Amino acid sequence: MGAVGIPLTAHCVVLFLLQMVALSSEQFTVNGLESPVLVPLDGNLELSCQLSPPQQAKHMEIRWFKNRYSEPVYLYRNGKDLFGEIVYKYVERTELLKDDIGKGKVTLRIFKVTSVDSGSYHCFFKDGKFYEEHIIDVKVTATSSDIQILMHPPNIKGVRLECHSGGWFPQPHMEWRDSKGEYIPATSKSHSQDENEFFNMTMDLFIKSNSHWSATCYIQNFVTHQEESISIVLPGVWDSWCPAWIMITLLIVIHMTYYIKLYRTYATKEMLLKSIQSSSQSSTVDTEKKEWLLKSIQSRIQSSSVDAEKKEWLLKFIQSSIQSSSVDLEKKEWLLKSIQSSIQSAIVDRGTKEWLLESIQSSILSSIVDQGTKVLLLKSIQSSIQSSTLDIETKELLLKSIQSSIQSSIMDLGTKELLLKIIQSSIQSSSVDLGTKELLLKIIQSSIQSSTVDLGTKELLLKIIQSSIQSSSVDLGTKELLLKIIQSSIQSSTVDLGTKELLLKIIQSSIQSSSVDLGAKMGLLESILSSIQSSNVDLETKVLLLKSIQSSIQSSTVYLGIKQWLLERIESIIQSSSVYLDTKELLLKIIQSSIESYSVDLGNKEFLLKIILSSIQSSSVDLGTKELLVKFFQSNIQSSSVIPGTKKLLVKIIQSSLQSSSVDLGTKKVLLDIIQTSIQNSNVHTERKGLLLKIIQSSVQSSSVDQGTKEMLLEIIQSSIQNSSVNQWTKDLLLKIIQSIIQSSSVDLGTKGFLLKIIQSSIQSSSVDIGTKSMLLKKTGLILKSSIVNPGTELLFQLIESIRHSSSVNSETKKMLSEITQSTVQSSSVNPVTEEMIEEKYQLLLQSSSVNLEAENILNVTTQWILQISSVNQGKEMLLLDKIQQILQISSVNPETKDLLLEKIELILQNPGVHQETKDLLLERIQLILQNSSVQKETKYLLLERIRSILQSSCVQKETKDLLLERIQSLLQSSCVQKETKDLLLEKIQLILQNSTVHQETKDLLLERIQLFLQNSTVDQETSYLLLKRIQLILQSSSVKKETKEFVLYIIESILHSSSVHQETKDLLFDRVQLILESSSVQQGLKCLLLNMIQVIFQRTSVQKEMKDLLFNRIPLILESSSVQQETKDKLLDIIQSILQRTSVQEETKDKLLDIIQSILQRSSVQKDTIDTLLDRIQLILQRTSVQKEMKDFLLDRIKSILESFSVHQETKKLLLNRIMSILESSTVHQETKKLLLERIQSILESSSVQQETKKLLLDRIHSILKSSSVQKETKNLLLDRIHSILKSSSVQKESCNKRNPFWKKYALDLGISVFTIIVVTLIMHLKQREADQHFELNTLWSKDTSVILCVLIMFNNRLKALIYFRLYGFSPPGKAHKYIVNYILRFSHPVFCIVYSATILYMYLQIQNKDSLFSLYNSWMVEMEMVLIFLLVIFNVKNIATVLLYFDSTTLRLFFWIKG
């Protein structure tokens, strides 16, 4: 019945699967230590676990973790320790012992166990998908047997007992018990934990006076159950006083007896000491006795058996001897050595050492001791400090003595300076250990912080600190200690303000110094910042610290990376809640001064503003800080000292904050308050207001800005419109914004509705003046007349209807509203609509060609009069200027009308009575006209003519000119302005600068603008090119005054020095300088000025390397150019000469200049006159005694390389050698210079790379020098010495020394040796094979090849190589020896020889094929003769081969000579 359901095979499969599951689930188990495992605190813990059954675990994942699987204490996977995934605090404290990992056993070791290491540890093994773990509980404990009972002095009530015990973990149980073991309640209990987390327990018990007690202090650790106890037996309190009185009486009697005896001994010893002193100081006593006396004193001082009293008397004797003037310096030195050895001795006790040091100190402080003795004393101190044998306790005593000496007011400043030099050398010394240095630095710290030490001493101490920080020899640990001293001194309230100021000056100079490493600078800044954040530091000190930070930010010498790090730290301080508000206020003042400073670059300013923005946007920053930040923003926007570029950055930041969704509504409200106050403030510039209003417009129209922000923005618009203090121009801009928002299709209906409500409330309000209402209604009319119809316009119609029916609106407003809505209203009464109509008529009249010139003139006079009246409101002025702009831009208006109109504009700008704001508005319109590409060129030309006449006029105010120049600058910087317009504008600038009648102040202003423009990296290359072209024309013009040219050159120099100027702009500027120097029409005076400027650039170390490289590239071009006048070249070479002679100029610059000289002399394109002049300069430099030896050495190296060069023309070399001859002939030249020169001549003659012709020329010159009678005898002797050494030298070729030898004689010996070698090698091989009864094989033939190659190598004067080859291969080279030989020849010979050799080998192969016997071939005299003839041909045609090579390749020629040599 059971068999029906499932077949047998199915049963088998199921059973098999179940077995597999059972096997896979029981691969291994993990066993380990039993819990709990106890470990002592600060000890090492070892936890082990084992796989069961034992198996290999190297391939498994082994993970030790505590609470979380993802936070391993140790991780091992696939045979690797994964330190990157271990929890940070266990990385350096754990290790896994894997000695028995093959058996599946591992041990985790944890070092320096802390309290947090308690808990459950999981030992987790994972193999593939299978895993198992074992859990071990660990408990950290610490017990102590150190337990004490302290009994306080008894009183009438009783006695207090105090039980102490330390070094327990975890917190133990502590109690008092009586003699029966019963619990006694404690009076009080307390505990504390030290830095190692050990518990220190204290327990009090008060016992009354009328009882006899036995008390036990009992303490127990609950984890280990270890118990410790201590007992005390107490008699009655009053009974204990009787023996005390007896003891006191006995002590008094004993002391009295002792002091009487001591007094008697004292008198005797004093007499004895005086006797010793007189003996040692007496001149009658011989030296041997004195020495014996001093040695005995030293041995007694160092002896432990001599009592302290005797030692004290001896030390008094030493002190009096040192201070005595009658004792000679040698004896004093000996005494001090004995003191030093006693101090450094380990057997001398502490008391003796203290007395010795006191005697040294008193001698140093004493005014009667001479300076020589004091120097000896100080040297003794120094050697003791720096001694490694001296124990730390003695060093402490010694340093205390030094400290008291420094802080003493009676010590003179000279001695203090010597003492401080000792301290400095000890700090900077690498032999002095860190502990000693720490003690020394503590002395410095206490002296700085002490109020008793005078300011001069403190200044000396601070100089030590400064030199140690800046020194590269001082180790990092010492510098860290120094920085801690600085920080503690700054934060200390005991240190006076003058000392702190000195300290901060040191910090500042160290930060700005290039010699101080980056780590030390960061440490100094960190100490300043931590002091600022500290609540202990007073406000005056913080002010000093912040000034130091300010100078670091504004300094150009401070590295950019340090500045950015500093600014980041400032940001964290601002955002910190722990820092006080007054500190933050001071920090913001620094930021503000940095923003207003011209020395701080725009990049750092942007970074500062971003810091403030992030602080405003941060939710962690408190409201008080945010208010300070907002005030800062407001003051910077409203400040006149802040440059426009910075203000634009501020405005951009505000805009991004308003449009950001991450900024909370409260912060936005604070920012909007800034905008509102700035708009309504009359002191804020109109341009800044315009930027702020653009922010409002873009934010309202932006879809990313939330509705709450938009409502707040619109409320600002409403309050500004309704505010009577806001000027009409601002209101007009606000109304334009309203108009554009209503007409915009991107703005949602809700925003438009809100805007219309603003208009309605403003029209209905009685507080709003009639002028504002008129403007509002006018804008309403413009919206209604617009062809753009959208829901906003419909809403406006509804608004008009509601205003008409409103009872709160007065009749006049309603009347104006009705006039606007009617398109054909004609009214004679004065109202805004009439004004608009008059303006329209005025525009039509001016545009009409039928109107006569007289009528136009009347109209223009009227315009001028309206703009000049200060009572006319700004809104009307704006409208009028709009019309003027339109007239000038329209091409249909005739030029005469435009000219008249521009004449009137000029008169307005020249009139000092016209308001500056009106002029600014007018100039804004002029800028817009010039930027417009649709405006005719003729109109622009007329306009620029007027600008020129304004700038040239002396009656125009400086402010007006400044405004005008600002507009010109922005025009040139704008990329949308046409090139043609810029060219016209620059032409006018040129004419102004060339005009001698123009005031110098105007020219200065203009040139300042040019400088700012060129330094701006955003300006395009084309505009820079145009401007530099004009500068060139100004400098070349003879009509321009010298003062103007000098100012232009000053600007050029400052641009070139500036690191903010783009490299391409500098390159363009150099092009222009080069063109000026090349021009013959330019005056020589101007060229001299330019060249002086170049000299200054070269000599300055602050000038960038790239800058100098650009200048270096130009010098060869100027000198090579034939168009440049010789006079200019002379001046340039004079400058090069003076630079080379200067010691202050950098070596790198000089090296570069010498490279240029060398390249000029090596070029064939350079004119002969230029070379001659250049060589004159070289001669002058070498003849001058004031020029440094190193400089001359440099120059002579260059001369040598020129003479050795193949590319230098022979004529140039001839000229150079003429100069060398004239130097050697000159009697004024220093003998050392001549010696250097002759050394170079020797090296040239000895060199194989120098051409034969050059050597010949040089030898001719030497010959003429020796013949000359004008040459000094010393020079000739030096020259003959050099010739003698050259002739002796084996490296010199025969060609150089003996030119007349026939060519074949040189190789006669080589040829003989070659033939002899061939014969010898052949005979040896023949005899060798005969003895062995062997037949000749092919290898025998290659032995002949070996002899051939020997012949070739010897032929090339290379016997050594031949011998090496002979030794390497022996008599029988390998079977394919010809391959090695051919390769060798290819490397060291010419291809012609290879062809000859290959032909020979081929011929030999052909002969082999035709002969039966190799032996007969070997004996064939024909082959031998042919080979000899071929090699003789090669030998006697070396000259011809050399000639061929000369035409083929100069490099191969050099190689040929090298092999030959």
Swiss-Prot record:
Residue ranges annotated for the Ig-like V-type domain, each copy included: 26-139
SMART domains: IG, IGv
Subcellular location: Membrane
Signal peptide limits: 1-24
Membrane topology: Multi-pass membrane protein
Chain positions carrying an annotated carbohydrate: N200
Protein keywords: Disulfide bond, Glycoprotein, Immunoglobulin domain, Membrane, Repeat, Signal, Transmembrane, Transmembrane helix
The keyword Glycoprotein is assigned to this record: yes
Disulphide bridges, residue numbers: C49-C123, C163-C217
Residue ranges occupied by any Ig-like C1-type domain in the UniProt entry: 142-231
SUPFAM superfamilies named in the record: Immunoglobulin
Family in the record: Belongs to the SKINT family.
UniProt-recorded name of the protein: Selection and upkeep of intraepithelial T-cells protein 5
